[in-house]
UniProtKB/Swiss-Prot annotation:
Function according to Swiss-Prot or TrEMBL: Catalyzes the conversion of 4-hydroxy-tetrahydrodipicolinate (HTPA) to tetrahydrodipicolinate.
One Pfam family this sequence matches: DapB_N
Active-site feature positions: 145 (proton donor/acceptor), 149 (proton donor)
Ligand binding (NADP(+)): 39
Annotated GO MF terms: 4-hydroxy-tetrahydrodipicolinate reductase; NAD binding; NADP binding; oxidoreductase activity, acting on CH or CH2 groups, NAD or NADP as acceptor
Record keywords, A-Z: Amino-acid biosynthesis, Cytoplasm, Diaminopimelate biosynthesis, Lysine biosynthesis, NAD, NADP, Oxidoreductase
Major subcellular location class: cytoplasm
Lineage of origin: Bacteria, Pseudomonadati, Pseudomonadota, Alphaproteobacteria, Hyphomicrobiales
Swiss-Prot/TrEMBL GO biological process terms: diaminopimelate biosynthetic process; lysine biosynthetic process via diaminopimelate
CDD domains: DHDPR_N (cd02274)
Record's protein name: 4-hydroxy-tetrahydrodipicolinate reductase 2
This protein's GO CC annotations: cytosol
Localisation per UniProt entry: Cytoplasm
Annotated residues for binding of NAD(+): 12-17, 87-89, 111-114
Length: 258
């Protein structure tokens, strides 16, 4: 007997990724678009309130803002569901703590990128960081996005930074250099640098360079269309539906070894 489609609600349904997700869900026979919601004052014309959407869905896919995502996680946990797929970026420590607390009650997949290729890049970067001694190999992360992106470095760039730091057995916050300006002095060993570009309609470009005396290794990924993020979010929604509570990421969804 065929399984019934998983009921999906889309948060931020009028945003760029929200509109992309609506189209992708409607095109997938494994899913049913149960509800769309946006801001509290955006109801009607096919949009419902957040509370109505949560009651109608098995999984909510959320590409909104850090504050909205953290609040959504709290509300979902308080009512015992539904599961969440969160693609928002730019969270502060308190918002991340709220999501982690909610994940004790409901299953949540949160990722800075839902691209399969990008998540493969994260794994390769971590392997390279383990192999390249920080005393000899400097790590630099570059990212570029469209002019409308409001956080920097991007969530994906921070994922890559975490991969470098994790491969080296370090804490990213202790070794990250997010800004360089003026007379900065010589680069300390083990530092992880970030460079950011914002302009035009760039969907997303990321690279990690390991620089040693006489050689340079660069691993990179470029996004040409937001549909790849939608495909990854759908894979996450299919995977997380029916899972036990916990905070998961795309490595769990894709079955990558830790």
């Amino acid at each position: 007997m065929a399984q019934p489609p998983i009921r999906i609600a889309i948060a931020g349904a009028l945003g760029r990724m929200g509109r992309q997700m609506v189209e992708a869900v409607q095109a997938d026979p494994r899913l049913a678009l149960a509800a769309r919601f946006h801001r509290p004052d955006s109801v009607g014309d096919g949009l419902v309130s957040r509370d109505e959407a949560l009651a109608m869905a098995d999984v909510v896919i959320d590409f909104t803002t850090p504050a909205a995502s953290a609040d959504l996680a709290r509300v979902s946990a308080n009512r015992g569901g539904p599961a969440l797929v969160i693609g928002s970026t730019g969270f502060d420590a308190a918002e991340l703590a709220d999501i982690a607390d909610a994940a004790k009650t409901v299953p949540i997949v949160r990722s800075g990128s839902f691209s399969l290729g990008l998540n493969m890049l994260v794994g390769l970067v971590e392997q390279a960081a383990r192999a390249f001694a920080p005393e000899d190999w400097d790590a630099e992360i570059f990212e570029a996005h469209h002019r409308h992106k409001i956080d920097a470095p991007s969530g994906t760039a921070l994922m890559l930074g975490q991969a470098v730091a994790g491969g080296r057995g370090a804490e990213l916050d202790a070794v990250a250099r997010r800004v360089r300006d003026g007379v900065t002095g010589a680069r300390p060993p083990g530092e992880i640098g970030f460079a950011v570009v914002r302009g035009g309609s760039i969907v997303g470009e990321h690279s990690v360079s390991f620089c040693a005396e006489g050689e340079l290794v660069t691993l990179s990924h470029a996004a040409g269309d937001r549909i790849m993020f939608a495909r990854g979010a759908i894979a996450a929604a299919l995977w997380v539906s029916g899972r036990p509570p916990g905070e998961y990421d795309m490595r769990d969804v894709l079955g990558f070894d830790r």
